[in-house]
Amino acid sequence: MAFSRGPVFLLLLLYLLWGSDTSLIRLNENGYEDIIIAIDPAVPEDTTIIEHIKGMVTKASTYLFEATEKRFFFKNVSILIPESWKDSPQYRRPKQESYKHADIKVAPPTVEGRDEPYTRQFTQCEEKAEYIHFTPDFVLGRKQDEYGDSGKVLVHEWAHLRWGVFDEYNEDQPFYSASSKKIEATRCSTGITGTNRVYACQGGSCAMRRCRTNSTTKLYEKDCQFFPDKVQSEKASIMFMQSIDSVTEFCKKENHNREAPTLHNKKCNYRSTWEVISTSEDFNSSTPMETSPSPPFFSLLRISERIMCLVLDVSGSMTSYDRLNRMNQAAKYFLSQIIENRSWVGMVHFSSQATIVHELIQINSDIERNQLLQTLPTSANGGTSICSGIKAAFQVFKNGEYQTDGTEILLLSDGEDSTAKDCIDEVKDSGSIVHFIALGPLADLAVTNMSILTGGNHKLATDEAQNNGLIDAFGALASENADITQKSLQLESKGAILNNSLWLNDTVVIDSTLGRDTFFLVTWSKQAPAIYLRDPKGTQTTNFTMDSASKMAYLSIPGTAQVGVWTYNLEAKENSEILTITVTSRAANSSVPPITVNAKVNTDTNTFPSPMIVYAEVLQGYTPIIGARVTATIESNSGKTEELVLLDNGAGADAFKDDGVYSRFFTAYSVNGRYSLKVRADGGRNSARRSLRHPSSRAAYIPGWVVDGEIQGNPPRPETTEATQPVLENFSRTASGGAFVVSNVPSGPLPDLYPPNQITDLQATLDGEEISLTWTAPGDDYDVGRVQQYIIRTSKNIIELRDNFNNSPRVDTTNLTPKEANSEETFAFKPENITEENATYIFIAIESVDKSSLSSGPSNIAQVALFTPQAEPDPDESPSSSGVSVATIVLSVLGALVLVCIIVGTTICILKNKRSSSAAITKF
């Protein structure tokens, strides 16, 4: 039965439209509330970190208030403290705060020795980022010389996080040819003054020299750096170098530097940072304050053991599609392998009414796990009352003498319940976190709102058992606050429908970062299959434990499993047999973080025809893994699956190339309702490696300052090159990305409503008299297929091209045949009507058009300078420009003085000689 769509539902729907942003931040009367700063479990205990966090945020709040013209400040902040740190009377238990929802993470650096503060940002302009990453040394103030005051750095990163702006410097293009025909440092605003120099240190000594010009680029050489003057008067911009004392503002339209090749210009279409911030929802829902705000309020929350209640549906519909048995298989997997030791777990069954079948018990060994396994349901009947089950879970917590704050409810249901919306407010106010697993196509949508409102997970498992969705969903519910080295990670999840004597064969890789508690799980629907498992040395393992009643077999590898390729072969013994296999393992060494994959979509709810964006992040610790092979499987609630190859190429849906985030558009909607996401990642063909590049969206490193005309350099930061990146051993991972809901999908064939994706990586270079262009090909439908044609236009004015693309001069592209999506495109043309006298810039943009005449819109704008810019004059050489240098003037003055002295001296001598001659004659 469908529930009525009253005011409560509409309010919740509006909340959902915020997207899949995991942050719990709210803006309330100009103040940001519910900010979470989490200290990583890998950080050794040091309570001074907490005090430094408080000081940093307090200073940042004042700075933010002034920088935003008295609009925003930090109102209250929760600091999450690791469970491994000693308890204190001032620490409280978290409610819905968790590491998953952290806005700022204090964690080890991405690469040892590099403490650069950055924001994990893999979305587009104006879109919120993931989190800010500070290292302990940075928070403790040990990197102030390199990055400046930590409070000002926090405001720089907050702008990335909250408003989706980007940096206004560019270390890949630190200099550019300005319209003044001079070489300028990439910055905003141009009012920031400084000196360009090469600063090199070796063997404890450092030397400095002038920058030379590169003969190819006509710009300064690679090692040239811009050293800002310590004393400045310019106030902008925070997104360039917030460490400058005078800088207190974001660049505005009036002082924005559109010429500079900054990432912000490229991503935000040459708008200033303040223009972007001014269009944000935060800005539009606030007005400047008349008084100064109070300092931030801090809550200290220490992670503690999990308190969870399983709330399992035993209504009559659970007898369909083998749902009851499949739920029990997945629950056994969760209770035996996923839930952590020291957790408190209880269990409730519900249909028309709810029954407490097990009070809270702390898991310390297999004894407690087995006690819980004995209480799994064996029969199902009756209706569905979800609120009854949730209220029974609250009673379980109360019976265990726990408040509901921070407790977790794992709710599984397959049915609709018109009364489910009645307890939404109670659930939200409880402080409990609801994780919802929707089983089948009819599970109630109101409960989806519960999970999102409480910060829980939302999963979908269809009735297509071969897709293994139910086991994947339970397996994804490990603690969000546990150390990653203690979590059970999924290496394999696969299934198939097979006839008698047919096989499910494949391999799974156990890499050196894993191997502890390795677990193989096989399930079937009719009769136990023949199971063959061989380790990397070829030794066969046959000692699986058979659980015929639950139709599952499992094997735990003692100690640390062998590194390498494990081979499995499963032989079906019945026709139309459904077999699945799941493999999990934990980190082999607590000091070496394992490779992980995390998956998500850009929004929890969507309306046709808006596309979804699928993301998969592959990391080792905080270090991105690039060059991996990543695929996503999207399953509708009817069981239909679509597979996408995710890309890290910086084109289409992917915002940044080689950042360890693999992305793709998804538009292949088939039905209304829920869809689930599952991602698989492996090492590819010996191509995966750790990225040692500096992360994007970070505070600028200060190479030094110009003080009283002298450069005072900082120690050069640690650098690495592409050549030093090691190729990784092969690995395999799978991960559940949760569920999303799509509405308004029409029945029947879908019309062509999807244009090509916008080109975002257009680059232009001047090659003799020709301009060469490169870009990544879009597709007929976003990043799939092939476009019909490209339209290339140019202009001498960047804003004219941006705002009036269709009326700008068009380049002849008769001989340009589009390639398949995600291919590299190249094209060269000779610009017309350009003379040496008026040569400045040419700006170029591309629009792609598909067979239905749908266009992508103009690309990012590339530019080419048609002149050789002037470098800073060298005092050792004659200047090439007109005018007289200071040295020339000085030499001229000295020469004139010498000449005057010679003339005066000669005159005196002549006069003396005349006097001598006259005296002799008179005397005579």
UniProtKB/Swiss-Prot annotation:
EC nos: 3.4.-.-
Residues that span the membrane, as ranges: 884-904
Tagged with keyword Zinc: yes
GO biological process, one term: chloride transport
Annotated tissue distribution: Expressed in the non-goblet intestinal cells. High levels in intestine and stomach, and lower levels in eye, liver and spleen. Increasing expression from the duodenum to the ilium, and decreasing expression to the colon. Isoform 2 is expressed in intestine and stomach but at lower levels than isoform 1.
Coarse class of the protein's main subcellular location: membrane
InterPro entries: CLCA_chordata, CLCA_N, CLCR, Ig-like_fold, VWF_A, vWFA_dom_sf
Record's protein name: Calcium-activated chloride channel regulator 4A
Protein encoded by which gene: Clca4a
